[in-house]
Amino acid sequence: VVITTKSGKQGKTNVSFRSDWGFSNMAIDYRPMLDGDSRRELLWTGLKNYGLYTGNMSDADAATFADQNIEDFASKPSTGWTDWKDLLFRNGSHQNYQLSVSGGNDRTKFYTSVAYTNQEGIIYKQGLERFTGNANLTHKFGDFEVQVTSQFSKVRQNKTNEATSYDGPVANYAFFQSPSSTPYNEDGTLNNGCGVFGVNPLYEREHSSDVYTLMKAFNTIKLTYNIWDKLNLSEKIAYDYAQGTNDVLWDRHSNNGAPGGVMQRIVNRNDQLNTETQLSYINSFGLHNIDALLGFETQDTEYAFNYMAGQDYPGDLYELTNAGSTSAETNRQSYRMTSFLGRANYNYADRYYLGLSYRTDGSSRLARENRWGSFWSVSGAWRFIDESFLNPVKSVLTDGKLRVSYGVNGTQPSDYYAYMNLYKYGIIYNGQSGMSIVGIANPDLKWEKNKTWNIGLDLSFIDRISVTFDYYQRKTSDLIYDLPVSQVGGYYDGNYGYTTPQNIGSLKNSG
């Protein structure tokens, strides 16, 4: 997969600035609600019908019964009916700004840009702020060319929980909270408890928060050496970093946080370091065209997860270090993969095509005996529209190609340590600390292999209508499947799955 970003061009330095502003709201009247008077009338009719058909009352007595009981179901506050949609939703807005500078000469080209986005959501306290930057530089010197790319971003998102529990119920309460409920006390302060479940979503909104911050950086450097004419040697190093932090707070005044407040912090971090060494050759000899490549690749990935929670705060400074009691959970995983690969493509007159590829991958997710897997493919194509015997129909059939391919690829286990015995310390049974098995070793686990062949036909008529036909068959062998494991032996995987991956069965698909 090749991702191309914006780059500079030879010529004068170009400075560009753009900005835009806008507004947003609900596109439709989602879940239309009755106003207070209409709801009161509907409930009054229901009470009257109850008296008529259940209490066997006369029409007049049923109406009196409804008048006597309507205040219990749809009383009108002295301040008027409450429009919860109006209180909880608003018109959102956004503003975007972008500045870029680019330029260069015959040896050096550069491009850099910064951008800022600020959005206010249609729910109060909901919004997003994003800052991004991008820079790339290309410089040629002698037989060398160096390319440097750097991208980074920081996103801060204020969220609101749309659940219907005490964990910050905001949005959903707009659709089933009674207009008879009053969110404010007589002195103008927020009412702590009203309506359905005794929850005031405005009060909960002010005493809870959910902030997610994501920081990402992607940096690459590539050095290319022109050994001879069409023969090039390149080395590329890429580092990808991402860290997301989610801070969720229910203070001591909220329903969920009472009486001492609860704060949770979840941190996810992903690091990936990739290297690519490639020797490539691209050339043409008359009608003969060759594209060949040899490569060596490495991938080093690390994932870290941290969960921290604090509660019983003595005051209103909600940081984990101030909590009366804390708990934590951590998880760290990593894996590496090394690959050797080769590819060769040949075509004659852009009419007859032949392609070959081969690679062997070694993954740390498998035991040493089964770590390496070899995969290959062969393909061919015939652009028959260029044949002279089709000249009479070329005014209608403007393009045609026949394709055929066969290949083998592999899938590694999703679990980083499926081949190893794993143990975990912690509270295991009846509140007692101890150690349990959380991973049963399977040193025989190996690559899942997919063998696929395909035949296809591409047709184009009068340069306007394109038709593609494909038929394929794929057979998967050594299928990786999570096999149930007996709990009698004390196995505990932490997710109550009680499974271990095995290579069992095969699968065939065609279509």
Language-model segment annotations:
Residues 98, 274, 337-343, 351-353:
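Short glycine-rich loop/turn motifs
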Residues 16, 100-102, 113, 136, ...:
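Outer-membrane beta-barrel architecture
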Residues 19, 114-120, 354-363:
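Transmembrane beta-strand segments that form the barrel wall of outer-membrane beta-barrel proteins
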Residues 9-80, 121-128, 132-216, 234-338, ...:
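Surface-exposed loop/interface segments of Gram-negative outer-membrane beta-barrel transport/assembly proteins
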Residues 1-18, 94-96, 109, 115-120:
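A beta-strand signature from Gram-negative outer-membrane beta-barrel systems
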Residues 368-372:
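Short glycine/threonine-rich loop-to-helix capping motif typified by GTGT followed
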Residues 5, 103-105, 116, 139-141, ...:
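Residue-level signature of outer-membrane beta-barrel architecture
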Residues 87-91, 101-105:
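Outer-membrane beta-barrel initiation region
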